[in-house]
């Protein structure tokens, strides 16, 4: 990814999108066991900063920062960055239960460990709702029982499926797990709560959201009072020059 070559805006947007998609796929493969939950790319004039979101940041960093240095070297070589022009950081996910990617990975490991599908899905569903989500949906499809493939859907709370608010409120993650009977597909959708501080959810309210303002408490007067204020006494004229002549 050479930033020195002049390219059109259209090609630049496409190039940035491909770079982020390939980087996300690479980190998903490398950090699958470390709770990888997404990546954010910040481009500055001097260098490119890559923030890796994960639930186990200590494992991403490695002993004395060895792992993060190895990842930096691999990304630098893969995407043709100059030395010192790229920097990788690890950031801990604020609310693990509200991250669809983290919960999809958690469900994948539960199914790999031999836990029953229904029990594993209900465990993930309960954990997401206890973390403060407005709603969630878990779909597992494949050869669940017998040789015929089918899908099981588990839903709790409120979930929106269309409209622009989906882009802000709904997080989606898809994963695949290879079991003895075949490959199972996992899809997790989490609807985030409204948060004016923009920490665990979007600060933009839903279009149909109605907020009721509590009325102010009225002051109870025990004795008659008046709001009439006595005007201050007029200032005496010490100097005749201040007097106005009619």
UniProtKB/Swiss-Prot annotation:
The keyword Ribosomal protein applies. SUPFAM superfamilies: Prokaryotic type KH domain (KH-domain type II), Ribosomal protein S3 C-terminal domain. The modification Phosphothreonine is found at residues 223, 226. The modification Phosphoserine is found at residue 241. Pfam families: KH_2, Ribosomal_S3_C. One of its GO terms (molecular function) is endonuclease activity. Residues 201-246 are annotated as: Disordered. The keyword Nucleus applies. GO terms for cellular component: cytosolic ribosome; cytosolic small ribosomal subunit; nuclear matrix; nucleus. Residues 23-94 form the KH type-2 domain. Has DNA repair activity directed towards the mutagenic lesions 8-oxoguanine and abasic sites in DNA. It can cleave DNA containing 8-oxoguanine residues efficiently. Also acts as an ap lyase, cleaving phosphodiester bonds via a beta,delta elimination reaction. Interacts with LTV1; the interaction is RNA-independent. Belongs to the universal ribosomal protein uS3 family. This is Small ribosomal subunit protein uS3.
